[in-house]
Regions:
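Long, low-complexity segments enriched in small/aliphatic residues
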Residues: 369-400, 404-405
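Flexible "cap/lid" loop of the alpha/beta hydrolase fold
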Residues: 270-288, 358-361, 368-382
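N-terminal export and membrane-targeting signals
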Residues: 1-17, 238-239
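C-terminal motif of bacterial Sec signal peptides marking the signal peptidase cleavage site
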Residues: 21-25
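Short helix-capping/linker segments at secondary-structure and domain boundaries
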Residues: 347-361, 402-407
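Structural motif
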Residues: 326-340, 347-352, 382-390
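Gly/Pro-rich cap/lid or specificity-loop segments adjacent to the active site
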Residues: 49-338, 394, 400-522
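Bacterial signal peptide processing site
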Residues: 27-30
Length: 522
């Protein structure tokens, strides 16, 4: 079993993901509660001439909002340390209160939502992140440093920590031993007794600790939180960016509140057409493709620390750890399960790839500290943020009704080993984690967004968290989806692909909708 490790500089910046499948009226509206261009480091050519769309609502200067912002510049920089953000950025924070609205107590209870504001623009632009990535406030702070200046001259980014994450009444209910067992588990072991036991205990402890909160952590109620924030900001329509699984919150919002949708960018949307097994299988395929891109990138840099065959180096490391876990300085161990979860996490952020290659090589040489640090935020959290696994489990299991028996999961592991030799077992095992959790009464509705303005979707070809086909199928299902395909790698295109970022800039700032579809090369 691996003891929580101390985070390195690397782990703070990594988008860590466990293999869990998981203009109407003149005033602020009430809630309804009960194309080919060069991208990356190559200078981008102009995308295909976009079409001016009168269907996109104008940007709003908000009426007087009800949010009292206070300076949080120092604490934000401390939370992101050792990441250095430009001194020109300043950060303000606030809290707003939304209804908890548990299924067992509709309309009752409260949840406090943590917000962060960065940018000097008059129009608020809400930012919603993955459950298993940085809290939305910190993701917005990092995103502000990656976007062209025009974004922050037009908008103030408003990062929102989703209920149960970051500073929004964070969930911290999974016993440490269970958390470690889930992350450490041997991805080749089809005897799932230990993993099932940890999942069962985790679900029981969270249900006891959270009580009525447990069932109130889901996408639909988070969409209600978005409308609460919209009202508090003083706008009739909310402009927003959803990253990864955070995109699903915005499609749910578009279905529930189409008249309050402004300009929305969904960067890496989950596939709404797949069940849990289909999602895990798509992720396994995408993770394999992303690792291939990572290996090619390593070799293209010269003197790749993983040698001429990075996949073989990783396989050798995993085989070694399967029988001889590496001791860590804090008394813990690096197992093959922890190592593979760490690699999956590191693949998500392309800027971390050089450090990931070095970490794998050092682990292969007997020093696993840097590789273990990639899963630190999942297992141990940080001094200011709880472990991410807890909210990811609770919310993820509330969003899907599929529950697989251990025998089904073991059979799936065997079936996927040939097609997905690195990540098939790990992603198949993830299908067991929701088994002990209560099944939600209603499935998550398929997104339609009927009556909403055009919604821009950014797809990344090799995305190990939300595979590119998810954005493509979401665009097909939405009444007004417009797709930009980036043929690159990593989790999300915004701020990573110059082409996709430019398309989003034209859409958000100028109100121009790109050709559908538009393709951006790597």
């Amino acid at each position: 079993m691996v003891t929580p490790v101390r985070l390195s500089a690397l782990a703070v910046t990594t988008t860590v993901t466990l293999a869990l499948v998981l203009l109407v009226g003149c005033t602020v509206g009430p809630s309804q509660r009960p194309g080919l261009v060069v991208a990356g480091s190559v200078p981008a050519q102009a995308p295909p001439p976009p079409t001016k769309s009168s269907a996109l609502p104008p940007l709003e200067r908000p009426a007087q909002g009800a949010i009292g912002w206070t300076d949080c510049d120092t604490v934000t920089r401390q939370r992101l340390s050792p990441v250095t953000l430009p001194p020109t950025l300043t950060f303000q924070c606030a809290r707003v209160v939304s209804a908890l609205d548990s299924p067992s107590a509709p309309g009752e209870g409260l949840v406090r939502l943590q917000l962060l504001k960065v940018g000097q623009g008059p129009t608020p632009l809400l930012v919603v992140n993955d459950l298993n990535g940085l809290p939305g406030t910190l993701y917005a702070a990092e995103l502000a440093a990656q976007l062209p200046p025009a974004f922050l001259n037009t908008f103030s980014l408003i990062g929102m920590d989703r209920r149960g994450t970051g500073g929004s009444d964070p969930v911290h209910c999974v016993p440490a031993a269970d958390r470690e067992q889930i992350v450490d588990y041997d991805p080749t072991d089809t005897d799932l007794t230990g993993l099932l036991g940890a999942s069962l205990d985790a679900s029981q402890q969270c249900i006891l600790a959270l009580d009525t909160r447990s069932a109130a952590l889901d996408t639909q109620r988070t969409a209600e939180d978005v409308d609460t924030v919209r009202q508090q900001l003083g706008v009739r329509r909310i402009d927003a960016i959803g990253h990864g699984e955070g995109s699903r919150v915005l499609t749910a919002y578009a279905d529930r509140f189409p008249g309050h949708v402004g300009r929305m960018v969904l960067d890496g949307s989950p596939d709404p057409t797949l069940d849990a097994t289909g999602v895990a299988k798509a992720r396994a395929a995408a993770a394999e493709a992303t690792f291939t891109a990572f290996a090619s990138d390593c070799q293209s840099r010269g003197a790749c620390p993983l040698g001429g065959a990075p996949d073989s180096t990783l396989e050798q490391l995993l085989a070694q750890l399967r029988t001889r876990p590496e001791p860590l300085a804090d008394g813990g161990q690096l197992t093959n399960g922890t190592a593979l979860n760490a690699v999956l996490a590191g693949l998500a952020d392309r800027s971390d790839w050089p450090a990931l290659a070095t970490a794998i090589a050092r682990a292969h040489g007997g020093d696993g500290a840097e590789l273990a640090a990639f899963v630190g935020p999942v297992v141990a959290g940080t001094a200011t943020d709880p472990p991410r696994l807890d909210a990811d489990l609770a919310s993820g299991c509330n969003d899907q009704q599929d529950r697989l028996a251990p025998a089904q999961v073991a059979a799936t592991m065997k079936a996927w080993t040939g097609a997905f030799p690195l990540f098939g077992g790990l992603l198949a095992q993830s299908l067991l984690l929701c088994g002990p959790w209560p099944v939600p009464d209603q499935p998550l509705p398929k997104p339609v967004g009927k009556g909403a303005p055009p919604i821009l979707l950014l797809s990344t070809a090799n995305d190990p968290v939300t595979p590119g086909t998810g954005s493509q199928r979401t665009a097909q299902q939405l009444d007004s989806g417009v797709l930009v395909n980036w043929l690159g790698s990593g989790h999300g295109a915004l701020g990573q692909s110059a082409c996709a970022t430019q398309a989003a800039q034209h859409y958000l700032i100028n109100g121009t909708v790109p050709a559908n579809p538009t393709t951006c090369p790597p």
